[in-house]
Each structure stands twice: as structure tokens, then as C-alpha cells.
Amino acid sequence: MAPCYCHLENRAALKIEGEDRKNLLQGLISNDALTLGRDRAAWAALLTPQGKFLHEFCLVEQGETLFLEGEAERLPDLTRRLTLYKLRSKVTLTPAPEFAVVALFGAGASEKAALPETAGAAKPVFDGIAFVDPRLPDLGLRALLPRDSFAATLESAGFEPEQSGAYERLRIGLGIPDGSRDLEIEKTTLMEAGFDELGGIDWKKGCFIGQELTARMRYRGLVKRRLV
């Protein structure tokens, strides 16, 4: 398959800015926010205090801004929840509709973006930022690109528009969940959804919301069902 692109219209971007941006997320989400940088993206989740799924998203940093890409329809709810925890932290949360979330996949996609096929590898490219999918490099790349020009930019770089839902078939075939389409809100746990195997949990980072149940399921082998 030639390198292709797919505009993920069900995903949207949020800008997280301010000197406390990483520290705020560090105590809330399942992955290590302190290790994020312009060369490393991560996949993470926000849980209920009881350890049940609320939101999943990718995070990547560019300059002094953390970009979060998550479910478009549910981004206001995620923003509201993060704001509740912000308190006096020096953090601002701003929707970024000027960016489109785009999947780049197929033979040679990473090479065209000059990225190694390493989960989470990231760099500024194509007038935005791209990163190898932090869950599984076989899924290709994610990119946050200017909405008005990404198609022309990518086609000039040798990417073709996807045909007949090729990216969705690839995602499903690899068993990669896509937000609340595949995970039950306030019901699914991270261990059931494969977050451990897909790099969505950092067990060394310290506490996060819902950590107690998540850790107990891991260390006591309490997982009774899994997403397949």
C-alpha cells in the first residue's frame, strides 16, 4: 500500500499551555506527562476515581504548548474535567480547531516524515507536528496539521487520500480502541482495554486518578474480560 492519509474527523486538538501544564497532567492521567517533549508523544487516559474509563488521548509537545488530541464530540467534557482539577495551577486550556488530526499510514509513511518506526517518536513536519502512533507503530503516524492546507501539503509530499476506509480496517484489525466507540464510559477499565500492552500506563510515575484499581487488577490478575 502506498503511503496514505486519512482526516480523522472524529478527533480534535486541545492546546494546554502554562508553566504548570505537565505537573497538572502528571497527577491526573495514566501515563508520564513529565517525559513528553517535541520528540516524544504518549497515549494516556483519564479515569474516574474508581478506575473506570472516561477519556483517552494522545499528547505531544511543541514549543511551550502541549497538544492533546482526543474525541472531538467529547473534548468539551474532557476540558471541563481538567479545568476542575486546575485550581490555581498556571495552565490554560484552549480548543485548537485550526489543526486537523490526520492519520498517515502505509509503506514508507514514517520515512516520508523522517521519523523512525519507534512508538511515540515525534517531530515538527508538514507545517505541524507528527508522531508515530504511541500504541503500535504498525498503525502508522498521527499528525496535527493546519486544517486549511494539510491535504495539499501531504499530497505534494507523496501521500494519497485513503480509499474505502482503509485506515479504519487497519485499526480494527490491529485491535486498537478508539475512544467511546470501543470503550464503555465509566465501565471499561484500562486493563480490559489493553492499555498496559499498548503503552498507555506508566507504572513508575506515581499516583494518578483511578490508579488503585488499575494496579490491583494488574498485580492480582483480576482481568476477567479484554477488548479484542
Task: Map each language-model feature to its residues.
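Basic, glycine/lysine-rich polyanion-binding surfaces/domains
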Residues: 1-228
